[in-house]
Design a protein with these regions (language model features):
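Residue-level micro-sites within transmembrane alpha helices that shape
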Residues: 5-6, 74
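Generic low-complexity segments that are intrinsically disordered, proline-rich and/or Lys/Arg-biased
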Residues: 8, 24-25, 139
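Bacterial N-terminal signal peptides
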Residues: 9-20
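His/Glu-rich zincin catalytic helix
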Residues: 20-96, 114-121, 125, 129-132, ...
Length: 212
């Protein structure tokens, strides 16, 4: 997996080459960048600000792939993988991002698992390394797991009586029935309560691969 993230890093660094100032009236140019390992990316250069933004997505790794009885798995992983990674616990990892003005977030949709990274160009090496750690060496410490679980459970309880959430659940269930799209990405109170670190690690091994 580290080889995969070296390839991703190579693509990301391409976005920071040739720093300068582009004419304001210049049309946006989208470039296709392919790493030596086959990672395909689409690059838009804008040199007006010293920032690098990168969005990634793993297709076929969304909530619709959650195993029966473990609904909400992808969603919970999206809330956990930036809560400590490698040698850094949650507080240390978060402090490193905050001190360097690095923004890192993840989301699990029905079809894919996505992430977004924004950093000052001078902090790009640290930012890419934090992204690599989050995706390849998340810790899933007990404190973070229970804190994120409590947040999800609170949201599920609120959604039980929220008209918009009720309408959404009813719509997807009526349209898709027993198909995985008919399930709610956040899972249920029962399934979320049963998720554990082994489930999260299994998801990471399965989902975060170049083939996705």
């Amino acid at each position: 997996m580290n080889k995969l993230f070296k390839q991703i890093a190579g693509v990301a660094f391409a976005a920071t080459l040739g720093i300068g100032f582009a004419p304001q009236a210049k049309a946006v140019e989208v470039q296709e960048v392919i790493s030596d390992g086959g990672i395909r990316a689409w690059l838009i250069e804008d040199h007006m600000n010293p920032l690098m933004t990168m969005d990634i997505a793993f297709t076929g790794a969304g909530a619709s792939t959650d195993p029966e009885g473990k609904l909400g798995l992808a969603n919970m992983v999206s809330g956990l993988i930036d809560e400590g990674a490698g040698e850094m616990d949650s507080q240390t990892f978060r402090s490193e991002m905050e001190n360097r003005s690095i923004s890192l977030s993840f989301d699990a949709g029905r079809d894919d698992f996505s992430g977004s990274l924004t950093t000052l160009t001078r902090e790009r090496e640290t930012a890419i390394d934090l992204l690599r750690l989050a995706l390849s060496e998340p810790r899933f410490d007990d404190e973070a797991v229970e804190r994120i679980r409590a947040q999800i459970v609170s949201g599920l309880k609120q959604a039980e009586n929220n008209p918009r959430d009720i309408a959404s659940r009813t719509f997807f269930a009526s349209i898709f029935g027993d198909h995985p799209y008919g399930r709610q990405p956040s899972g249920t109170l029962e399934t979320v309560a049963g998720l554990n670190a082994n489930d999260f690690r299994g998801f990471v091994r399965r989902a975060f691969a170049k083939d996705n």
